[in-house]
Amino acid sequence: MILIIYAHPYPHHSHANKQMLEQAGTLENVEIRSLYHLYPDFNIDVAAEQEALSRASLIVWQHPMQWYSVPPLLKLWMDKALTHGWAYGHGGTALHGKYLLWAVTTGGGENHFTIGSHPGFDVLSQPLQATALYCGLKWLPPFSMHCTFICDDDTLQAQARQYKQRLLAWQEVNHG
């Protein structure tokens, strides 16, 4: 099962993420957990989140890039759901062998996220990749959609279909 942990503080403003979720939602064995819908008060139900994580073979962290990082509720979700003794540390093997995909949207162009005058995705992904590895997750190459503020609808739809194809390809290879 694919579990998409979706974290967008203003989901009604994001055509890109909406289209990504619509495409992913057409696949079988996909569960989408919209954190800002589930937890508007930031009071995370750790047991429910860990139960959802337990059912998944592929975990996707889908969100917009905010100040070169994740939205605040996703960071809090990581702090609360990925607990010592469950996700890491002594006895913390619940996520071992599962896969993690970082699916991120940006308002800036792809060149804005290359090494040079701005940090590249390899640099920006390091905290997330380190978290994944620390929890025994297998890190997959990220999926990114750039220029989402200025893309026309056809471009966004094409990129959302690429996202769906990426998830479908993972399902076909991993039977999940």
UniProtKB/Swiss-Prot annotation:
Please cite one Gene Ontology biological process associated with this protein: potassium ion transport
In terms of one coarse class, where is the protein primarily found? membrane
Per the entry, what this protein does is:
Regulatory subunit of a potassium efflux system that confers protection against electrophiles. Required for full activity of KefC. Shows redox enzymatic activity, but this enzymatic activity is not required for activation of KefC.
Q: Which reaction does it catalyse?
A: a quinone + NADH + H(+) = a quinol + NAD(+); a quinone + NADPH + H(+) = a quinol + NADP(+)
- Molecular function in Gene Ontology: electron transfer activity; FMN binding; NADH:ubiquinone reductase (non-electrogenic) activity; NADPH dehydrogenase (quinone) activity
Keyword set, alphabetical order: Cell inner membrane, Cell membrane, Flavoprotein, FMN, Membrane, NAD, Oxidoreductase
Write down the required cofactor(s): FMN
What the entry lists under Pfam families is as follows:
Flavodoxin_2 (PF02525)
- Membrane topology value: Peripheral membrane protein
Matching HAMAP family, A to Z? K_H_efflux_KefF (MF_01414)
Q: Which Gene3D superfamilies match?
A: 3.40.50.360
Q: Which family does it belong to?
A: Belongs to the NAD(P)H dehydrogenase (quinone) family. KefF subfamily.
Annotated Gene Ontology cellular components are: plasma membrane
- Compartments, as annotated in UniProt: Cell inner membrane
SUPFAM superfamilies linked to this entry: Flavoproteins
Q: Where does FMN bind?
A: 8, 14-17, 65-68, 105-108
Q: How does it assemble?
A: Homodimer. Interacts with KefC.
* Protein name (record): Glutathione-regulated potassium-efflux system ancillary protein KefF
Q: What is its EC number?
A: 1.6.5.2
